Regions:
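Flexible gly/pro/ser-rich segments immediately N-terminal to CXXCH heme-c attachment motifs
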Residues: 112, 146-147, 206-216, 294-306, ...
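Acidic, Ser/Thr-rich low-complexity segments on the non-lumenal side of membrane proteins
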Residues: 50-65, 259-314, 319
Length: 432
């Protein structure tokens, strides 16, 4: 009875804390400006199935894709066992599904989970070595120093502990059943690991304690992971699906029109026009200076970022030694958004995304090639943020690199980037 009460309290507390934090994150995302992402629902659903559920873009790099796929499948299938854990926790039973007419199906499912857990254990060690021993370049860039690196390693540690607790529970149960009836459960891995690690224990009470340690350890790791998730880059586990559904379906390279500019043009063409949303107190702004100037999809992108670095690894500006890192753009956006969240969603703290987090040098290093957008496994669009920040620099602060000043002047005067009169534009065709 005590265990049921403790389990119930922990469950309510854990879910309550997680819900409270997620409400805060959603409130932060809703600070963004409106953007239309509800058109073409069938195509959006197809994109979500292929990119998020099917992991389509992950397989551009087969080795890491296979390792991640093991994690992904194990995470989904293991939830079946978690259902049993919760039923046992609320009812005070133990392996309730084993004692039913579906015993063989139950053994098959647990065996599948064990095989996947073992593969995940190997994949976890591989991921750890890639980050800390092999030290792949994209995992050792300056934006990952400090907390981001600790975050990645901490989640790998959680995964290892979770797997150890699962096999402790199953192995002790297997050894206990063999001791008492000479016939075990027959789980794929525990039928070997149980006797190997616990076979010398001849006291069923000790085996029961070990099983409970594994059960409670498994449960606590789930609760810890659940409430750690909103503070970690692994929030993409939840946000990858809506983020891919709300992907930009326009062709890459197509820039969005600015509503403020469109309104200004309409007013220039028809001075008598007064748009319904504009009042005499409304001051049009161009581009984005802070997170509240970006769209809600930009902010969802920031929280969906996995910090995998695929975007940065293909960025031509970064490859040639420039300051730009698309991954850092997304990380900075999320960091600023979290700071605004701590200020009760108030952006008026004397700071801004542009300047305090992202520098002008980073923005102007971007070639707008869309390589980062193409490479992202969850369809994040760093270029959209970069363009909006550059628009603010140009249209609000008149800050333009000298390399672009001549081009913009020519476009204004001649309607083309070149310093030729429009009347002379076709003279080259007359040359021999």
């Amino acid at each position: 009875m005590i265990s049921i009460v403790v389990f119930s309290l922990l469950s309510v507390l854990s879910v309550g804390m997680f819900t409270w934090k997620m409400r805060s994150i959603i409130a932060q995302i809703r600070l963004g400006k409106k953007t239309q992402r509800l058109d073409q629902p069938s195509l959006r659903f197809k994109t979500m199935l292929l990119v998020a559920f099917g992991q389509k873009k992950m397989f551009n790099r087969p080795i890491s894709a296979l390792l991640h796929f093991v994690f992904y499948v194990a995470f989904i299938i293991t939830q079946i066992e978690l259902i049993e854990v919760f039923i046992d926790g609320f009812s005070g039973s133990h392996r309730i599904f084993y004692h039913t007419d579906f015993q063989q199906v139950y053994v098959f499912i647990i065996s599948t989970i064990e095989v996947l857990s073992l593969l995940t254990f190997v994949a976890t060690l591989a991921f750890f070595s890639r980050r800390n021993i092999v030290k792949l370049p994209r995992f050792n860039m300056k934006e990952l120093l400090g907390w981001p690196r600790k975050d990645a390693n901490l989640i790998l540690l959680f995964e290892l502990l979770l797997i150890i607790f699962i096999f402790t529970m199953n192995g002790a149960d297997e050894a206990s059943k063999l001791l008492q009836s000479n016939v075990g459960y027959g789980f794929a891995m525990s039928q070997y690991l149980g006797p190997l690690f616990f076979g010398r224990i001849n006291n069923p009470e000790i085996l029961e304690v070990l099983s409970k340690i594994g059960w409670w350890g498994h449960l606590l790791m789930v609760f810890v992971f659940l409430n750690y998730l909103p503070y970690s880059k692994h929030l993409h586990i939840l946000f990858a699906f809506p983020n891919t559904y709300f992907s930009n379906l326009d062709k890459k390279g197509k820039f969005s029109n600015m509503d403020a500019v469109t309104q200004e043009v309409k007013l220039m063409l028809d001075p008598t026009l007064v748009p319904a949303e504009m009042t005499s107190d409304t001051i049009a702004s161009f581009g984005a200076k802070d997170v509240n100037d970006l769209s809600w999809k930009n902010l969802l992108d920031a929280y969906s970022c996995t910090e995998c670095g695929r975007c940065t690894s293909v960025c031509p500006a970064n490859i040639t030694g420039k300051a730009l890192s698309p991954r850092k753009i997304m990380m900075d956006t999320r960091d600023r958004l979290q700071e605004v969240g701590k200020n009760n969603l108030n952006c008026k703290d004397g700071k801004s995304l542009l300047g305090d987090y992202i520098t002008e040098e980073e923005l102007w290093a971007c070639t707008s090639c869309n390589a980062c957008v193409q490479e992202c496994p969850v369809n994040i669009d760093p270029l959209s943020i970069i363009v909006d920040l550059r628009r603010f620099l140009v249209m609000e602060e008149s800050k333009v690199p000298s390399e672009l000043t001549g081009m913009l002047t020519n476009i204004e005067n001649n309607g083309a980037p070149w310093q030729f009169s429009p009347a002379d534009r076709l003279k080259w065709t007359e040359e021999n």
